[in-house]
Amino acid sequence: MGRGTGENVGFTRTVRAAVVAGAVLAVAVVSGCTVPSTLPNGSVPQVAPVGLNGMAQDPTAVGGNVWAADYFGHQLLRFDPDTGRIAERHGGLCDTDDVVVAPDGSLIATCAGEGTVVRVQRDGAVGVLAVVGRGVNPIALEPGGEAVVVGFGTTDDDRLLRVPLDGGPVEVVADGLPVLNGFGFGPDGRLYAPTGGVEALLGSTGGLIAIDVATGSTEVIPLQFDEPGRTGLAFAVGVDVGPDGTVYIAQGVDPALYAVDPATGHAALVGRSPEAAADNVLVLSDGRILLSGFVGNSVVVFSPDGTGGWIRTVTAVGS
């Protein structure tokens, strides 16, 4: 079925409606409900998250080293990608959309609805690092570890901002950018970001850019797919970069993961997700790639099979 047919548009609208309906239901379920960080016996509650959004790996954590932001659940949680067991959680927060682990072990998260960047200490203390504007979404730790960069997931704000972790003044790195979503730094020091936002749903126009955060200059990387007729992604939602420079980008609707060579733009299909929608990407230090979902507690794990292919498994986080 070619891109742009009436049947394809109808399918996209149906999936989008299902995702929105699921999100509304999720909000209703968790309204006024905060899961405690620990139970009276000291154990961590295994209540499943409402959704798994932005993710980050914690290099020092034991018993589960992946942090995830749960936007609708207003929490951050750390889990084991092999078993799904939740090892740590901090609830009662804002609309947490994305998260990174700071060099001191604290968590830095974006709060889309509140328009803030917050720091969550491991003892549960929360402080506002910066007020940047509603719609703030993706976050990435600069390679030097002294600041984070944040972008916006709406058409109302086209900036990329640098937020120092020492509380210094926020700087505008670039403006005039397309709608950004989950992004990550590559080994070349550039920030790779998906573009197009939700508006790319019907036209499959989601793409990829690289940003030089030192100068603010951007490069559009034209994607070249093996699939006939495909020129872009239906809602490009997340990016992370492997140590060899391969850029992994997720399509949110009809969710799929692609491996992109930034030098050529060639986008090879890694695999598809069985979930209704994807949200973000995380490349683990062991070579596996995680694909989170907009709603629900499942994370899709793609593991190298040793022959250039991938093995797909699904881990349910919590219970």
Residue locations for each model-derived region?
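Short loop/turn segments that connect beta-strands within beta-propeller blades
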Residues: 80-84, 120-125, 163-168, 212-216, ...
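Beta-rich, blade/repeat-based domains predominating
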Residues: 45-64, 92-104, 132-159, 176-200, ...
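A short loop-to-beta-strand structural motif that recurs across blades of beta-propeller domains
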Residues: 75-77, 115-119, 158-162, 206-210, ...
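A short beta-strand motif characteristic of beta-propeller blades
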Residues: 39-47, 85-90, 124-130, 169-175, ...
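Conserved beta-strand element within WD40/beta-propeller blades
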Residues: 68-69, 109-110, 149-150, 193, ...
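Secretory targeting and sorting signals
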Residues: 5-38
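Short, solvent-exposed loop/turn segments at conserved positions within beta-propeller repeat blades
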Residues: 71-72, 112-113, 153-158, 199-206, ...
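Blade-level signature of beta-propeller repeat domains, shared across WD40, Kelch, NHL, RCC1
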Residues: 280-319
